[in-house]
Amino acid sequence: MFLQHGGIILAFLGAALAVGLSCVGSAKGTGMVGEAATGVLSETPEHFSKCLILQVIPGTQGLYGLVIWFFALNVMGAFSGGIKDMTLAQGLTIFAACLPMAIGGWLSAIYQGRVATASINIIAKKPDDWSKGIILCVVVEFYAILCLLASILLLMNAL
């Protein structure tokens, strides 16, 4: 069965990893920030919107993973009448094209969550300087965007 459908299996696995790992990383990252924010909000509930913005930032990688999932399924023909037959090499190409977003999205979401969690301390101590924490988070976001771009470009040239 793998020899007959191995290409399709690998392509689906790559797409699933792109969205799955990115969402796992985003869940971990946003969860860490939410935990840290509850302490601040118990003392100063007026900082809710600032804390919420920091919490949402690590969630973007999950969205990027979903974009790659759609791109991969589009390359496979899922939105144009049915999945195409593909060779093992073609499936491996799609699988490999999804890896930058899968691995990069997963790890960058966790590390961005750590930066955003630390940035919650800025809100607790100097609420007017909270935008500095956002800027620090954007540095990590840049690498998630590079992973997204790499996977998109690879998928555009996959077959």
Predicted regions and their residues:
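Hydrophobic, small-residue-rich transmembrane alpha-helices and their short perimembrane loops
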Residues: M1-L159
